[in-house]
Amino acid sequence: MFDINWGSIIYQLIAFCVLLWLLSKFALKPLMGVMEKREQMINDQIDQADKDRKAAQEYLEQQRLAVEKAREEAQEIVQKAKKLSEQQGQEIVEAARAEGERLKEAALAEIQREKEQAVASLREQVASLSVLIATKVIEKELDEKEQEKLIAEYLKEVGEEL
């Protein structure tokens, strides 16, 4: 039946082993090196992506905190501005009140001065008229001393009436 050729089988087996050894020496090792480099590169990229993701999360958290802090600072600035505006409003009202009081006092002082001037002017006119009337009534010349006495009495009477 079948006759097995052992020499051919051994030759093919040796040739296969030599081919396997050559492939492993020159093809498989460089191919495995490329595969290992590729695997390492993929692992490095995954690690870098994880680092980048963590860094992005940290940056996002920092930005969130910065926005929150800025919001708080803005709220604080608004509160300070409101407080300052209320304080300035009160100061303006107080200044206006004080100015009004000062103007009132000045007006009262001016009225008092004008009243005193009017009274003095009236006294002078009354004194002049009194002298004229007294001169005509008495029909005599008064000396200066008597005239002053008469004026003082008349002014005293006029002052009491005022």
UniProtKB/Swiss-Prot annotation:
Cell membrane among keywords: yes
Pfam families assigned: ATP-synt_B
Annotated SUPFAM superfamilies: F1F0 ATP synthase subunit B, membrane domain
UniProt signal peptide: none
Keywords of this entry: ATP synthesis, Cell membrane, CF(0), Hydrogen ion transport, Ion transport, Membrane, Transmembrane, Transmembrane helix, Transport
Domain of life: Bacteria
Membrane-protein topology: Single-pass membrane protein
Gene3D superfamilies, A to Z: F1F0 ATP synthase subunit B, membrane domain (1.20.5.620)
The keyword Transport is annotated on this UniProt entry: yes
Localization: Cell membrane
One Gene Ontology CC term in the entry: plasma membrane
GO molecular function list: proton-transporting ATP synthase activity, rotational mechanism; proton-transporting ATPase activity, rotational mechanism
Function: F(1)F(0) ATP synthase produces ATP from ADP in the presence of a proton or sodium gradient. F-type ATPases consist of two structural domains, F(1) containing the extramembraneous catalytic core and F(0) containing the membrane proton channel, linked together by a central stalk and a peripheral stalk. During catalysis, ATP synthesis in the catalytic domain of F(1) is coupled via a rotary mechanism of the central stalk subunits to proton translocation.
Matches recorded under NCBIfam families: ATP_synt_b
Protein known as: ATP synthase subunit b
